[in-house]
């Protein structure tokens, strides 16, 4: 089965998974149920129970059998495609197994789980989740790089504006007032008299 969370009591809680799963017969791959009908898992019995199964995929046998310890009465569940026995429907159980009575209890070793939307693999063999993480890291790196480029651009732009202002102030002729012109004229006339 795919990754699931196990509580302290030994049960697997499939409802905590983010993506739904379908359960298939290992022998012929016929779909017999999905995690939307998940009830409980018993690790000690290597089984899990669903409240419902896919119609026409599972056959409940008409004969009743008794468990080895004599505490349970059940009917076997068979795959309709390959006739493989894949689980049981408990008709009579002790109190501690009341939660699985009259439901579909499947043997973990007879079924396989396929998690929908989670096992997409690209050519490099990475899952979609791994690709998303790598893309996120790349985006963060690019964002950081772009921000540093922007800061450098701002610094260079500010320096360039300052240089342009300095150059334009040097190129402009100084506008002199009347007194400056008179002083130049006096200096010029003194030179010419000598």
Swiss-Prot record:
Keyword Cell division attributed: yes
Location within or outside the cell: Cytoplasm; Nucleus; Chromosome, Centromere; Chromosome, Centromere, Kinetochore
Residues covered by the Mis18 domain: 20-116
Sequence segments annotated as region (Disordered): 174-194
Predominant location: cytoplasm
A Pfam family this chain is assigned to: Yippee-Mis18
Residues where Zn(2+) binds: 25, 28, 79, 82
Signal sequence region: none
This protein's UniProt keywords: Cell cycle, Cell division, Centromere, Chromosome, Cytoplasm, Kinetochore, Metal-binding, Mitosis, Nucleus, Zinc
Sample GO molecular function, one term: zinc ion binding
GO CC annotation: CENP-A recruiting complex; chromatin; chromosome, centromeric region; cytoplasm; kinetochore; nucleus
Positions with biased composition (Basic and acidic residues): 174-186
Entry keyword Electron transport: no
Effect on the protein of changing residue 90 to A: Loss of function
InterPro entries membership: Mis18 (IPR034752), Yippee/Mis18/Cereblon (IPR004910)
GO process annotations (BP): cell division; CENP-A containing chromatin assembly; chromosome segregation
Quaternary structure (record): Homotetramer. Component of the CENP-A recruiting complex composed of at least mis16, mis19, mis19 and mis20.
Family note: Belongs to the mis18 family.
Function: Component of the CENP-A recruiting complex that ensures the integrity of mitotic spindles through maintenance of kinetochore factors mis6/CENP-I and cnp1/CENP-A. Maintains the deacetylated state of histones specifically in the central core of the centromeres.
Protein name: Kinetochore protein mis18
Organism of provenance: Schizosaccharomyces pombe (strain 972 / ATCC 24843) (Fission yeast)
């Amino acid at each position: 089965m795919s990754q699931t969370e196990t509580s302290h009591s030994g049960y697997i809680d499939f409802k905590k998974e983010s993506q739904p799963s379908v359960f298939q017969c290992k022998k012929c791959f016929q779909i017999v149920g999905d995690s939307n009908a998940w009830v409980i898992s018993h690790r000690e019995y290597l089984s899990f129970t669903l409240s419902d199964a896919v119609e026409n995929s599972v056959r409940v046998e008409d004969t009743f059998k008794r468990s080895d310890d004599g505490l349970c009465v059940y009917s076997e569940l068979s795959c309709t495609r390959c006739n493989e026995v894949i689980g049981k429907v408990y008709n009579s159980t002790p109190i501690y197994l009341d939660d699985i009575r009259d439901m579909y209890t499947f043997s973990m070793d007879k079924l396989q789980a396929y998690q929908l939307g989670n096992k997409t693999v690209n050519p490099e063999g990475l899952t979609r989740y791994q690709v998303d993480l790598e893309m996120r890291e790349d985006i963060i790196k690019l964002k950081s790089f772009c921000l540093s480029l922007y800061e450098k651009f701002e610094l260079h732009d500010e320096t360039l504006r300052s240089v342009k202002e300095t150059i334009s102030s040097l190129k402009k002729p100084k506008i002199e007032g009347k007194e400056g012109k008179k002083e130049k004229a006096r200096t010029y006339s003194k030179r010419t008299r000598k």
